[in-house]
């Protein structure tokens, strides 16, 4: 799969100094809609976009068994306290490209875990993970970071993955809005992720605290799910202090990498 086939016309590595390209994508634990492992193709796609910030959901980490050495080849040197190795998809690409990363696992199992991640080639300050689980059957979190983007302007970054039921989602939206009002100050802000919000409840709710949804503001459908034939606008990106310029959900080969299409926005940072 070539980078050219998946690249975006506006995701150029040398955009205007005050412009930002942002991507939100539910990685479906690194598997395609047909169940095949697609992580390598996902990684190639992210490399090709040259975005300034990536908001990822369902980024997967698996526990890899500790190495076992055969007798006579140093097995006696193995320490029982040696930890197993965790293979994390988001960390892999961050290390490969020398990007900054913030991780916020939501689901913890003995052999695997998954959750949110924020990646950026720009400096990141980590703000932590906030538990926004509405009930014990769906573990959800709000991942917080701050990046220095577009001429050394700090931008607050929030990555979320909301519940499947409307009642739980509404509670989570109110919690996130409360966090923003209390903790985010007045500077530029981006809130992105898989909101599971085909009813668009979030657009009005976050609009009350001064956030605009990118695709909605541009008059676009915002549909990203299911990837092979998008019918629902489950993924959202809300901004404050940034002007939306363009929205896109790529088609073609990108439709077979995850069950969601990437949500891509080109934004301009408002002048101070």
Role assignments for model-derived ranges:
Residues 21-27, 45-81, 119, 145, ...:
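Active-site beta-strand/loop signature of hydrolases that rely on acidic residues for catalysis
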Residues 96-132:
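Catalytic-core segment of enzymes that process non-peptidic bonds
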Residues 28-33, 77, 129-134, 159-167:
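Surface-exposed cleft-lining segments at the edges of enzyme active sites
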Residues 1-11, 124, 146, 174, ...:
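Metal-dependent phosphoester-hydrolase catalytic domains
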Residues 10-22, 114-116, 120-125, 138-159, ...:
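Beta-strand-turn-beta hairpins that frame and shape the catalytic cleft
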Residues 110-111, 135-139, 166-168, 255-257:
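Solvent-exposed loop/turn segments connecting transmembrane beta-strands
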